Design a protein with these regions (language model features):
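Substrate/ligand-engaging "lid" and interaction regions
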Residues: 1-277
Length: 277
């Protein structure tokens, strides 16, 4: 059966295991520099007729492959409840001195922030059954806590602005539409991303090295050079090249982002995030 089918993959793949590579190569008895670390969990959703499973019986190889009429609900659930929290927890954790996703989840403050974003905000924007969403979100947290995968938050922060636009911004809009107020955690996450792109050093001396398109890097560099968080807020939210629209048109967003930026500058990330929990 020839055809082109929409697909979705779900697996956390931190990449090259720098810390463990020597031990791994010793175990396999040869030098392999193409090793990739990944979690055991995996899911491949294929939007295709059931008969395609007969042509491609991946399940018989022990693989978690689903052939479904529509991959959209799986895509929406995964992007919202896994990728969405990833995108905002990473700058909050890193600027609080935490480097690994697992450690962020265990931290009493950052862990509470992650739970707020995932269960109290993003989950409220989806239309799937509540018990199904609760189960998926709980499973995602368990995956984040995987003791065998050291998922660096800096690897997640590559191209943070485009990621926020696709993973979190829809949730901001839907939450506002349904609740009549902005989701504090998601908006704080945007302020954290903006702060991360300021660069510089953490309190422990670790370099803050954002990585995005040159256009976005130049924009944030120039905005932060003004030393004015209002100008930074105005400039980022009005950047249609990032968002495809002017986010200043979202009621209350400018004021809340500015407030969060000021809190982060004044108190530091960890103390600032406590104010919304």
């Amino acid at each position: 059966c020839c055809g082109v089918y929409a697909t979705l993959v779900d697996r956390i793949v931190p990449g090259f295991p720098r810390k463990e590579i020597k031990d791994i190569q010793q175990k396999i008895c040869y030098e392999d520099n193409l090793v990739v670390q990944a979690e055991i969990f995996h899911l491949w959703v294929i939007e295709a007729p059931k008969e395609i499973a007969e042509e491609f019986p991946a399940d018989k190889a022990g693989l978690h492959v689903l052939f479904v009429p529509s991959e959209e609900p799986y895509h929406e659930r995964k992007v919202t409840l896994l990728n969405g929290p990833h995108t905002v927890l990473s700058p909050v954790a890193f600027l609080s001195g935490i480097n690994i996703v697992r450690d962020a989840c265990k931290d009493p403050v950052i862990g509470k922030y992650i739970h707020k974003v995932q269960f109290e905000e993003l989950m409220e924007t989806l239309n799937l059954p509540k018990d199904e969403l609760q189960k998926f979100a709980s499973d995602v947290l368990e995956r984040f806590m995987n003791p065998f995968v050291d998922h660096q938050v800096t690897s997640i922060m590559l191209n943070s602005f485009p990621k926020y636009q696709t993973r979190d911004l829809p949730g901001v809009k839907t939450y506002l539409e349904r609740k009549g107020e902005l989701p504090q955690g998601l908006v704080f996450g945007l302020a954290a991303i903006i702060t991360y792109y300021k660069g510089g050093k953490r309190e422990d001396g670790t370099e803050i090295v954002p990585n995005d398109s040159q256009e976005i890097m130049d924009l944030l560099k120039n905005l932060w050079a003004t030393g004015d968080t209002q100008k930074v807020t105005d400039g980022v939210l009005s950047a249609t090249q990032i968002w495809g629209e002017d986010l200043n048109n979202i009621a209350g967003l400018n004021a809340l982002v500015k407030k969060d930026l000021d809190l982060i500058q004044e108190k530091g990330m960890l103390e600032a995030v406590k104010t919304i929990l």
